[in-house]
Regions:
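Active-site and ligand/interface coordination hotspots across diverse enzymes
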Residues: 1-35
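Glycine-rich loop at the start of a catalytic domain that most often binds anionic cofactors/ligands
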Residues: 35-41, 73-76
Length: 135
């Protein structure tokens, strides 16, 4: 179930029972001369979507804008700073937790996202935003 394809009332009903949500992260960058620019996001979203269908969970909108400065010489690459990515991920994750999702699973498809994701998870574990929920 894609979160963006449901109403807020449907979400409210679904998260009455302890419920998690899965979010895919990837990148928008080159993958060779014939590879798709969205490969990392497409792959992580495909995996996340498969899990959500089997686990009856929501799939959050994917985050495909991530640190990829090393690929900026290739047209079509979109890169944001690690700090911007961390801020975006933290705010999105905090929003989901505040609305009642018990946990957020992150399926990552881009190597440069690993450290920023770890940083955000550490911040959420030590903040009130997590409120005993887990990422």
């Amino acid at each position: 179930m894609r979160l963006e394809q449901t109403s807020w009332m449907e979400v409210r009903e679904k998260i009455k029972d302890p419920q998690g949500i899965i979010m895919a992260t990837g990148s928008t960058e080159q993958h060779g001369p014939i590879g798709l620019i969205g490969t990392d996001t497409i792959c992580s979203e495909t995996i996340a979507s498969g899990v959500t269908s089997k686990a009856n969970m929501y799939l959050a909108p994917s985050i495909g804008f991530t640190p990829a400065e090393f690929n900026m010489k290739f047209p079509g690459t979109i890169s944001i700073s690690a700090q911007t990515f961390k801020s975006l991920l933290r705010e999105v994750t905090s929003s989901l937790l505040k609305h009642g999702f018990k946990y957020v699973l992150i399926v990552n498809g881009h190597g440069a996202n690993i450290d920023p994701i770890k940083d955000v998870i550490c911040l959420l574990y030590t903040s009130d935003a997590a409120d005993e929920k887990r990422c």
